[in-house]
Amino acid sequence: MPILAFTVSSCEMNLVPDGSIPEKEALRTVKDCDAWVLGIYSAFKNDALYSGSMALLQDIQADMAYAALKTNSGIYTQFYQWNIKSTTSEIANVYNGLYMIVSRCNFFFDYKDQVEATLKTTADKDDFKKRVGEVYFARALAFSELIRIFCEPMTTANANTENMGICLAMTYSDDVPMVKRSTLLESYNQVLSDLKQAEENIPAARTVADNPYFSLGAVYALQARVYLNMGMGDLSIKKDNEYLKKSVEAAGKVIKTGAYTLSDAVNNAFQVGSTQYTDYQMMWKYDQSDEIIWKIAMTPVSYGGTLGRYLLGYNTVAYSPQYHFSEAILSLYDDNDRRASVFCNQLEDAYGDQVYIITKYPGNPDLDGGATPKFINMPKPFRLSEVYLNRAEAYYWLGDDENAQKDLSSLKRKRITGFGSVSASGDDLLKEIKNERARELYMEGFRLSDLKRWHDPVKREKQLYSIDGSINNELNVKYTDAKYRFTTWPI
């Protein structure tokens, strides 16, 4: 498919190089649409996004990982030490990567009518309708991530403040730097509008587990996430909060589809060769599980970033990790919590020290061919566990401790051997919700934005074999500190 950059102006786009496809000719048939939408899916493989920077750097900037004393070579140091600005290459790459997806979606919308006018058969019309829904979802997801990472949390006070939202580029010819920033409410409303269109166009038959394609389950999961972020910003319990009620409703739709089940981390269910695996282990090693709502499909010859490369630093001889697992986070796991051994192992590094290695992304053997492992795993941007966590938190802010406890208990029973039920209430319940998000969503890119929306400090506690200092393993950035502004990445 032709690659069309979003940064060019409308005048520049009129200059067509010899031998290239004129812009208006790129989308003429259903087959053209199929190819274009596959290109949008492919854009999500970008190693600046879910398979790289966007997933790892928010957690590294927070408190999930510690720079290794002897094996860190300066990788991601700007983020770890909070020395970032809008021109920091990784930030620019995330921003541009998300807007590239928006741009590809907008190009489709600009020219979809000329395709629709040619449709004759029911099959072609159904296929086109499905593609329209997929593109609306892709744009909604990209916009939502831009809001989460590059904007302040929405509150009653700032919802309609000018220039606090994102640039809502709505046509391909829009030059993003020239588009005025919207309000936060306008930004979120555009996401919800796109999700409504996605819901109306994506077929129900797409709602299956372990899916590399967008589905109604993914639509509802994103709605639940977005409504939670819209509704909890005031950090006050309000039983009549409509955003939070809609978050609960959307999460319930995901669960009620019956298509997805929480992965079992307790009982062995699979055997590969001579090795027994739980469903949870299979999800993180082989990228397969009925808990997965949407994963980014990869092959040995078509993949994005390598999530485990710098975390493991393994060269078939020794481990030289750039970062170690945070001992403070590790202490949050119960002794019977089976996630801990999936995400972390104490191993000997290249210097003979016993260090906590981050093993969440060990590399899928079906993707990691060759003598030297690449540590490729398929990102899983939507899982059922996050849906339960979002609903539990929405229930908490609605003042419904009982249902929040039920959702947390449902998740924890699948993760912890012999777990009974959550009994915490009030502030203790909120603390447990926060801790459970840290345990379950470790190194998936949620931590910094979670701390930001809760106004919680970003605090690291000194640990062995990590680089010392107030900007390293003793970092403590409070909500009232000027430095806290960097929990929102600068544009």
How should each PLM-predicted stretch be described?
Residues S51-A68, T122, C151-E162, I166, ...:
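Short, surface-exposed recognition loops and adjoining beta-strand edges that mediate ligand/DNA contacts
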Residues V132, R139, L146, Q223, ...:
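Structural register within alpha-helical repeat arrays
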Residues V37, V102-C105, S144, Y188, ...:
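Inward-facing hydrophobic residues that define packing positions of alpha-helical scaffold repeats
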Residues G74-F150, S182-L185, Q197-T207, T372-P379, ...:
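Conserved, well-structured interaction surfaces
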Residues V176, S182-E186, N241-G252, K256-T372, ...:
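Extended ligand-binding clefts on enzyme/binding-domain cores
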Residues C11-Q61, A251, M298, G305-Y319, ...:
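Membrane-proximal, proline-rich intrinsically disordered regions
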